[in-house]
Structures are given as structure tokens and as C-alpha cells.
């Protein structure tokens, strides 16, 4: 834990909202840093440090960082659903109404996202009809948390359906790993023209996906056991994936 604290503290000391060290490549290129998925991942980690240590410096950094990007009317300097995950906890901890407004704004973006025929969200507008493992991490936990907190779980079935599609169509039965992406239209140059799948399993994407499963399991409200089967589906998929990855770990 001491090593983690030292690493995080040094990272934060050298970072500002305008120039976070985790986006150093953009800084070196002279590009402006905007609200992005890396910010979401890193600020979630900072908030985890606050939850564990109760050291106010972590909360202050996270709040200052996100506050800089979110305007009083809830509009945001940039578009990214993943970074929106930080807003729930910061709203709880600070009570800032602009965070609540920003949560609704991000959700409104989810409502109009284009979808594949399967019902899954496109990964991005520039990747039509494509489902990527990365996108399951970037979008589904936010979607699930909003439904849990503010929408009476009305779209739980939609969320579980998107996970089910990935589990049934993107898992490699030969090794238990998942292919990085699938083009449901079979048009992308990289996809198998029969299955629509990419040729490779990518460790980083599998990491995103495993966290999508785990984060969703932590968020889901199944107190009335209405979604027992769906929760078990996610649990089984997570355990199966971890057991499959262990076979490939370095000794």
C-alpha cells in the first residue's frame, strides 16, 4: 500500500486539471486537455484512495479536477461517458448541484446513442455497428448507476441484454478469453466476414471488460431478487474470465 500511496501522491503533485500527468502525451503535443475517459479512470482511483484513507487531499484533488470541467449549468468541457462515473460520488460528497445536472446531461447522451441491431451501443460514431470490450467499461457502469439511483431500474433489462450479447457472441470458447471487438455489420476491414469478430484478444480490453463486470456487480440493486438470473450471468462471466486469464499469467 505504501508504494501505491507514493505513486499516486507523486502523480497528483505534478498534475493540474489543465495538464494531468496521465495525459502527458497531449501536453507534449501542445494539445488542450479535455474531459476524457482517462480522467474518469484516474479520478475514480483518487476517490477510492479517499474512501480508504479518509485523507481530505484526495477528495480535494478529485473535486477541484472535476469542478474545473463542469460548469454551473451542468454542461461539461468535452464529451465522455466514462468520466461521468465520478459525478455520482462527488455529488454525494460535496452536494454540488452542478454535478447532479451534469449526471443528467451524460445520461441524456446515453439515451440518444446509436445502436447495433443487437441493441448494443455503437462504440463510437466513427465506429458504426461495432461493439468493443472497452465500451462496455466506459458506458455500462454509468448507465447502471443512473438507473439504480434515479430511474427506478427501468432500463436494467437493456443493460443486461448488452452484456448477454457480448458473453454469447464475443467469448472465445477455445480459451475463455474475449475478442476485442465485433462489427455486427461485417463491414470493417479487420473483422471476420462470417462472425464479425476481430482476430485477437487484447489484454487491455479484457481488463476494461473485467472491470465492467465487477463494477456493475457492485452497483446493481437486486435487493428484491428480481434480477437473480442476470446477476448470476455477470458473476459467472467474471469468474470464468478470471480463471481463463490466470492460465496466461507470467510465473
Please place each PLM-identified region on the residue numbering.
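Glycan-recognition and catalytic cores of secretory/periplasmic carbohydrate-active enzymes
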Residues: 1-251
